[in-house]
Design a protein with these regions (language model features):
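Secondary-structure edge/capping motif, primarily at the C-terminal ends of alpha-helices
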Residues: 40, 68-77, 130, 134-138
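Short secondary-structure transition hinges
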Residues: 58-98, 109, 118
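All-alpha amphipathic helical-bundle segments outside canonical DNA-binding/catalytic cores
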Residues: 48, 85-90, 106-122, 141-145, ...
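Hydrophobic recognition helices of helix-based DNA-binding modules
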Residues: 25, 29, 33, 37, ...
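Helix-turn-helix
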Residues: 1-20, 24
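Amphipathic, non-transmembrane alpha-helical scaffold segments
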Residues: 22, 26, 30, 83-94, ...
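Hydrophobic alpha-helical connector segments
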Residues: 24, 28, 38-65, 116-123, ...
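C-terminal peripheral helix-coil segments that are non-catalytic and often amphipathic
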Residues: 52, 56-59, 94-95, 99-107, ...
Length: 165
């Protein structure tokens, strides 16, 4: 409250508590995905679309969200008894990932022997793991750069037989 420069009354008018403020970060991420979605080329390989979305979101995170604040979000999601916003499959994030995964399977760019739900679950798990490590490291390295190295290695086995650059 002190860092935001607002009164306690104003803060609690907009947020029920600190957890509500922290969970609003997931909505910030969704707004970024809504901004990026129209920029996806229909011709681009869906695996590459996922890498693009990751790079852009992680660049936004690195440039505008402190590792400490992000760590608090993750911490609150671990202990909350209520809604876990990061896992809400009705979020824009999950809807967009499901669409891309389904299109990738239909185009032969992503494996068809793995369900769309499993592809999305593993992708989201990898992103959370990278963010968690970045927070543990106090933001000591470039999140988007490191992710662009590791994410293709983590997810490469999900690529289909058709490869395009």
């Amino acid at each position: 409250i002190r860092e935001s420069g607002t009164s306690r009354g104003s803060f609690y008018h907009y947020f029920e508590g600190k957890d509500a403020l922290l969970s609003s970060l997931s909505y910030l991420f969704d707004r970024k995905y809504e901004e990026l979605s129209p920029t996806l080329s229909p011709e681009e390989d869906r695996f590459q679309q996922l890498m693009y979305l990751n790079r852009e979101l992680f660049a936004m995170i690195e440039n505008s969200i402190s590792p400490d604040l992000l760590a608090r979000l993750y911490s609150s999601q671990l202990v909350t008894r209520g809604e876990k916003h990061l896992l809400d499959h009705n979020r824009t994030y999950y809807k967009l990932l499901r669409r891309i995964a389904a299109e990738g399977q239909a185009r032969g760019e992503l494996r068809r022997d793995v369900t769309v739900s499993e592809l999305v679950r593993v992708y989201a798990l990898c992103e959370r793991a990278l963010i968690y490590d970045w927070c543990l490291s106090g933001g000591g390295y470039s999140l988007p750069q490191y992710s662009q190295t590791l994410l293709p290695m983590f997810l490469g086995s999900f690529r289909g037989g058709q490869r395009s650059s």
